[in-house]
């Protein structure tokens, strides 16, 4: 059987660099190497692209994926053809955060006309920017908690007015978030104005735009969505925390979370969550994969929190576990995502690019 040629891209110039490497390790160890000839491209923290060809062995440690000593090559040269001498059947970007899941690298793949796994430029960019995402959810009629957003330059000029707006519109606790970052990097839970000021200072280290959201006493529920024009959603899972909130450290370092799959919810609530996840997928014109995150209160009020256009595939990750619960194994999920990438690229070839 002739193998298909796949290139996995990971690392990136982002605060989520190490998360991306951990995700790549998981995918490389799960992908069907009898079916796929796999090359990898590691993007350093400085933005250099380094390639290693024909990965066949198990990746024991993420240290093996820090290709710091390889030759930095031109991007177009790296993606022109695989180490087998044939064009890539698909590129699998496992990049998190800015410069990875925000539409930038998706635009590069579009220009180079290579099939790639996951969301396109528009859906990746709008899912990364929490303010734009919330505005699209609002247009779709999806219920959300109150929030405000502002820029670093606005805060530098109008700090007093912005703090007053937060205190007038929202009730503590509030969550301060960089608008364009994931994996809970830079997020703070604030119980008073002093903590709010510190949270704003922390978040502005990572982005020029912030979103401050109303806190709520609720369960954190997640739904995985898979597909292109006709997506499917899983039954919901729940994040059970042994911490104040689900931050970067608890997600990836401490392991102080448990995933309950499926979530213990009434069937009508589960169905509503699945339908809302599909609506969120459509609201941002997604393709491939999305994880939709919700809050569910004690009286079963549902609020959408966000969509994640490139959910992680680490040992703690909800997305693959939700599909395993639906009968789709991790290797099968990876194969399905590659097939969806090829399907979308084939559909794109139906477009005309010149007028007769």
Swiss-Prot record:
Q: Which cofactor does it need?
A: Mg(2+); Mn(2+)
Its BP terms in the Gene Ontology are: cell wall organization; peptidoglycan biosynthetic process; regulation of cell shape
The top EC class is ligase
What this chain does, per the record? Cell wall formation.
Q: What is its EC number?
A: 6.3.2.4
Listed pathway(s): Cell wall biogenesis; peptidoglycan biosynthesis
Please provide the record's keywords in A-Z order: ATP-binding, Cell shape, Cell wall biogenesis/degradation, Cytoplasm, Ligase, Magnesium, Manganese, Metal-binding, Nucleotide-binding, Peptidoglycan synthesis
- For this protein, what does the record note about how its cofactor is bound? Binds 2 magnesium or manganese ions per subunit.
Catalytic activity line of the entry:
2 D-alanine + ATP = D-alanyl-D-alanine + ADP + phosphate + H(+)
Name of protein: D-alanine--D-alanine ligase
Q: What is a GO molecular function of this protein?
A: metal ion binding
Q: Name one Pfam family in it.
A: Dala_Dala_lig_C
Which residues are in the ATP-grasp domain? Answer: 134-339
Keyword Iron-sulfur included in the entry's annotation? no
Binding of Mg(2+) 2 occurs at 306, 308
Q: Of which family is this protein a member?
A: Belongs to the D-alanine--D-alanine ligase family.
Binding positions for ATP?
167-222
Where found?
Cytoplasm
Note the Gene3D superfamilies from the entry.
Answer: 3.40.50.20, ATP-grasp fold, A domain, ATP-grasp fold, B domain
What InterPro entries does the entry give?
ATP-grasp (IPR011761), ATP_grasp_subdomain_1 (IPR013815), D-Ala_lig_Van_CS (IPR000291), D_ala_D_ala (IPR005905), Dala_Dala_lig_C (IPR011095), Dala_Dala_lig_N (IPR011127), PreATP-grasp_dom_sf (IPR016185)
Q: Where does Mg(2+) 1 bind?
A: 293, 306
Q: What is its main location?
A: cytoplasm
Quote the cellular component terms of the Gene Ontology held in the record. cytosol
